[in-house]
Amino acid sequence: TLLASSAASDVYKRQSIRRQSEGIYAMFHYLNYEQKYKRHHPDWEQRLKKMLDMFLQLQNPDGSFPRKFHDDFTVVDGSGGSTPSATLPLVMGYKYFKDKRYLSAARRTAEYLEKELISKADYFSSTLDANCEDKEASLYTATATYYLSLITNGTEHNHYASLTRKAAYFALSWYYVWDVPFAPGQMLGDIGLKTRGWGNVSVENNHIDVFIFEFADVLRWLSKEYNEPRFSDFAEVISTSMCQLLPYKGHMCGVIKVGYYPEVIQHTNWDYGRNGKGYYNDMFAPGWTVASLWELLTPGRTENILLK
C-alpha cells in the first residue's frame, strides 16, 4: 500500500495524494543525499518505483489526481486541487530512475493545472483538512511547474516558466505586505512579531503560518528568469520574517522548548476557540513547520538535483 497515515481523526485515515507525494519526495532527497556518499538502498528504490507506478494507476485521464482515496484506489474526494503535489515526486522519479513514464505523467498534471487552476485563477483544496480556496494550492502549482521548467528546454521550458510566474503571483496574494497591529498584552505584539512576509492559510483557516518550503527558491528563480527583482526581494522578506519565532535561550517567543515552532499563529479575531488573537493556538502539528523552515534555510536543493 501507499504510505499509511498515522493521525487518529477519520479525515486523516483516508489516503491523501499530498501525504503520499510528500513522503516520496522526502525519500528521494534522502536517496540523493546517500548517493553522494556512495551509499545505495535498492530496497527503498524498489519501494519508490512501486509507489510511483501506483501513482500512474491513480492518475485520471485529464491528468489530475484525486485528493483522497482508499487503499483499493476507490475515490473518497475527487477534487483535483492537490494534483500539483504529485508533480514533484513524478519529476524526481523521472530524474532518479530515468523512466519517461513518470515525466509523461508529470506533464499531464501540468496540462490539468493550466486548464483548471492557473487559467481560472482557482486554486483550491490542497490543504489536508479544509475544503476551500487556499494558499497551498497556488504555492504547490508554482512549485510543480518550476520543477518541469527545470528539466525542459526551449519552448516547453518557456511555457512552464510562464505558468510558474502566473501561479506565483497568485500565491503571493496570500502573503502579508504589512504588519498587523496587536493590542498591548497580546503575546504576539509583546514579543514584537511583524507579520509582513507571512502567509494566510485559507478562507477556512484564517491564520498565518510558515508554510513556505521551496517557494522562496521558486521566487528567486523567477527573479533571474524574468529579470524581475521584486520576486527575489520578497523572497528575502519571507526568509527573514519567518525566522522570527525560532525559539532559543533568551528568545523563547512563548514556546516552552527549543526545537519547536508554532503552527497556528492567530493574528485576527477569527474564532478557533483557543486563546484568540495575539496568541498561538495550543492545538498544532510541530513537525511540518520545522521541515518548511529547513527547506527555506537550505536554498537550491532541488536545482542541485534536477540540473546536475
Predicted regions and their residues:
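Hydrophobic core segments within long, regular secondary-structure runs in both alpha-
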Residues: T1, S21-F28, P42-L56, P84-T87, ...
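Terminal, non-catalytic domain-edge segments
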Residues: T1, Y147, I151, H159, ...
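Solvent-exposed loop and edge beta-strand segments that line ligand/cofactor-binding
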Residues: D10-I24, Y37, R67-S85, D122-T143, ...
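A short secondary-structure junction motif
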Residues: M54-P66, L113-A121, A171-W178, F182, ...
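Extended, amphipathic alpha-helical scaffolds
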Residues: Y112, S126-L128, M187-L188
